């Protein structure tokens, strides 16, 4: 419907599925297993063949329900498209796949690049590429791979691991003339 919708034509199912997929990819397998494992909602009752059976399903349903009413579908589409189209190499008019070379053109003096070991959306090898590129451009760069079970969401929720290196980096910047 070309992005035109009202409550009668609202893309509810698509939004719910998008949110569930997002939530699953923001977290790590270790977190899902530690949090939910294979715990059933009600182990005493025989479940429907394709009904909601596990606690993790209930959790994802609740996230999807909240998301549908709080996020505009067109905003979600534009945000998703912007992420798909972003290409640091293209924006620097450099060789099509030379990420390190493109980042070397950024005029930075200092950089801190943090990655979570369990982040599948921005894996450590990509974070290392960022650090390598910034360093090649002359930035005093520090790269840290932080061990976290939180996946992509680690930078939002694993404050005990992310705050100290950020604090140290900012303190060092304040001391630099």
Residue ranges and their predicted role:
Residues 1-66:
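Alpha/beta-hydrolase-fold enzymes
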Residues 62-63, 78-103:
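Active-site nucleophile elbow and catalytic-triad environment of alpha/beta-hydrolase enzymes
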Residues 66, 83-86, 117-122:
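Acidic catalytic loop of the alpha/beta-hydrolase fold
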Residues 91-99, 110-111, 123-133:
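Short alpha-helix in the alpha/beta-hydrolase fold that links the catalytic acid
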Residues 103-108, 134-137:
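Short, conserved loop/helix-junction motifs that constitute active-site signature segments
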Residues 113-115:
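Short beta-strand/loop motif that positions the catalytic acidic residue
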Residues 128-177:
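Catalytic active-site module of serine/aspartate enzymes centered on a nucleophile-bearing elbow/loop
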């Amino acid at each position: 419907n070309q992005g035109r919708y009202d409550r009668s034509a609202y893309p509810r199912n698509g939004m719910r599925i998008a949110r569930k997929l997002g939530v699953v990819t923001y977290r790590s397998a270790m977190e899902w297993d530690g949090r939910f494992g294979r715990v059933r909602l009600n182990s005493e009752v025989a479940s429907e063949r394709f009904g909601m059976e596990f606690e993790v399903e209930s959790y994802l349903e609740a996230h999807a329900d909240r998301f549908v009413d709080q996020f505009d579908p067109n905003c979600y589409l534009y945000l998703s498209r912007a992420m798909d189209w972003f290409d640091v190499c293209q924006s620097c008019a450099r060789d099509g796949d030379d990420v390190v070379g493109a980042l070397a053109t950024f005029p930075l003096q200092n950089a801190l690049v943090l990655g979570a070991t369990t982040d599948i959306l921005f894996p450590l090898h990509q974070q290392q590429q960022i650090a390598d590129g910034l360093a090649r451009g002359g930035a005093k760069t520090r790269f840290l791979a932080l061990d976290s079970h939180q996946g992509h969401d680690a930078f939002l929720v694993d404050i005990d691991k992310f705050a100290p290196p950020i604090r140290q980096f900012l303190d060092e910047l304040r001391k630099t003339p």
